[in-house]
Amino acid sequence: MDPRVAWIQPEQKGPANALWMQIWETSQGVGRGGSGFASYFCLNSPALDTAAAAGAAGRGSGGLGPALPAASPPPPGPTAPAALPPALLTALGPAAEGARRLHKSPSLSSSSSSSSSNAESGTESPGCSSSSSSSASLGRPGGGRGGAFFNFADGAPSAPGTANGHPGPRGPAPAGSPSQHQFHPGRRKRENKASTYGLNYLLSGSRAAALSGGGGPGAQAPRPGTPWKSRAYSPGIQGLHEEIIDFYNFMSPCPEEAAMRREVVKRIETVVKDLWPTADVQIFGSFSTGLYLPTSDIDLVVFGKWERPPLQLLEQALRKHNVAEPCSIKVLDKATVPIIKLTDQETEVKVDISFNMETGVRAAEFIKNYMKKYSLLPYLILVLKQFLLQRDLNEVFTGGISSYSLILMAISFLQLHPRIDARRADENLGMLLVEFFELYGRNFNYLKTGIRIKEGGAYIAKEEIMKAMTSGYRPSMLCIEDPLLPGNDVGRSSYGAMQVKQVFDYAYIVLSHAVSPLARSYPNRDAESTLGRIIKVTQEVIDYRRWIKEKWGSKAHPSPGMDSRIKIKERIATCNGEQTQNREPESPYGQRLTLSLSSPQLLSSGSSASSVSSLSGSDVDSDTPPCTTPSVYQFSLQAPAPLMAGLPTALPMPSGKPQPTTSRTLIMTTNNQTRFTIPPPTLGVAPVPCRQAGVEGTASLKAVHHMSSPAIPSASPNPLSSPHLYHKQHNGMKLSMKGSHGHTQGGGYSSVGSGGVRPPVGNRGHHQYNRTGWRRKKHTHTRDSLPVSLSR
């Protein structure tokens, strides 16, 4: 793995790390520029952990500049460059001297102009950055970039009030300010505050000792980059689960960050309203769904009556009102979706503005609905977004994938997981994260397989997707069918999908080793973070959030007028969702029957058979013994009045499920059999949506009952056979079970076809998850189930 993207793991640290990285540099032909400065040198520093930050707040940093008190954020505005500690200067050698000379040069931006075209066109890969663009980043005195290690100046101390030389966002730069002469578009990648690109050169050998102040009495606390880690975690996969929850709570947006973003939106909305009073500005993307990181951008769409999007007109108005930095406004009129990209002048928040794109607003509502369905989805998304963001793989523009593609991949992963019901909130997040990396880093066939989200989700051949595509494009490497726009490939522009696959594979290797039993023998197992092996937070992000909380602390409560449209939409969506959930199947019978299934085999086969055909080229071993964990699911069915009359009224009522006084309860179980006899009145009963059971009595009750597939509908009309399609009845008549694909017989009806509520998934534990693939093998044998009978 490229050491500029991957990191040296804690148990691998040693004196040979720096030598090995120099050998790798030579073998890859990654040389130093003419100045002697390494193009892969990291421009951010890892964040202090919680305990270290509190202990180091009140003392000097031992050569890295005065430390920032925990409650005092760095002030905005241009700041003076910081000095390097002597220990780190010695460790870096000629690289530091070359950077020092570059900082003195007055023609910095002009000397690096040759690299701007590639950076702006997006053709530059995340792993290849020119030395001139890296060097141009060094002298920037504000914006959270540069840091204590990279703003080199002869004897210039850190500016008062800065956190180790990492200033917060700056305000408008005055005339003649150095920042106006040192800005260059070639620094696009280096303006990512969360980037850990090249961090290994700060964590290896003597550089790591220099980073902590040389180990002397005035040494600064170590910087592991895991500020969310404030306690000891359980060993193995359970500890990773606990750490993901802590990371989510630490990185989730705070009210001050939301207030800051609303203020940015308000400024842009004011400019739009001045131009077009009838225009409507709406928010979509991560700010609308709440799945945004501290440095995420804001997506806006302007609705109005134009024949062509007025990109240039809005660009001129934004420049006139000084809303954005002049050099940051870019008009991408040749893109698939023409947009205006800008960076807010005051907050440095990046904003994307599009025109009349309804799909963005619909996509935000689509994601919100799935967040309600899968409560674990936000945790996975926030971890995955941080994982790609710090490697500059979070945008198609920089050679990665879009956030929308990532979210659809996560939804598909949860939909088609063969072993768990992702709608449950008690699943292990650590296991889900490792399996996500395994699927998309190792097992998924990017060449032949596409991803479908609608209709329960499926993996389909790209040839099938190509038949439905209306734009004339061929399926891309990462082919994701748009669930909202038929014929659109969401991953069409993700030309760097294979780089994302590579880092997913790297993360799977690292995490699977970290949670293995062997990891318990590591000498530093208690001090190191498992999630911190693949994710780190930079000090620049921490300082940026401090500055936000200080400045917008009094504005944290949203104004009613700002979010009125969003709140109304959410209220409407919530009401629609409640109506959908509360909708019951229509039936000519008026009484309800609460059915409790305590046998996991009653629901498992229908669930698994319906999703077999959607797993293309995959392997799931289903020959292993079934899971014995009991699962009881309750759902409502319509029962005929004559049948209810034959049931005793003294049967127990399930706890927590209030029913009308006319309701009766039927409990079916395969563990403890109860018998009762139904009197012999003649019954003319239509089929009801429940499983057929043998009933002993003088009269023959023969009704066909259909059971719908509760989890994932089949993508193929020919599902594989299931061992549970026939139940051997030991007590009563021997009757075959009908299929579960909505067919009817004799005037019967299917619960799904009639708008019925799908029952929850039964226990899918008998399909064990095989790490080597995702295929399901055909069942060639049958299993006898325990008898199911009803009697007094």
Swiss-Prot record:
Residues 744-756 have a biased composition (Gly residues). SUPFAM superfamilies: Nucleotidyltransferase (SSF81301), PAP/OAS1 substrate-binding domain (SSF81631). Residues 764-781 have a biased composition (Basic residues). GO terms for biological process: double-strand break repair; mitotic chromosome condensation; mRNA processing; negative regulation of nuclear-transcribed mRNA poly(A) tail shortening; polyadenylation-dependent ncRNA catabolic process; positive regulation of 3'-UTR-mediated mRNA stabilization; response to xenobiotic stimulus; RNA 3'-end processing. The keyword Ribonucleoprotein does not apply. Its EC number is 2.7.7.19, 2.7.7.-. Residues 428-486 form the PAP-associated domain. Residues 55-191, 601-632, 737-792 are annotated as: Disordered. GO terms for cellular component: Golgi apparatus; nuclear membrane; nucleolus; nucleoplasm; nucleus; TRAMP complex. Keywords: ATP-binding, Cytoplasm, Magnesium, Manganese, Metal-binding, mRNA processing, Nucleotide-binding, Nucleotidyltransferase, Nucleus, Transferase. The keyword Hydrolase does not apply. ATP binds at G360, K385, S403, Y404, N488, R492. Belongs to the DNA polymerase type-B-like family. This is Terminal nucleotidyltransferase 4A. The gene is TENT4A.
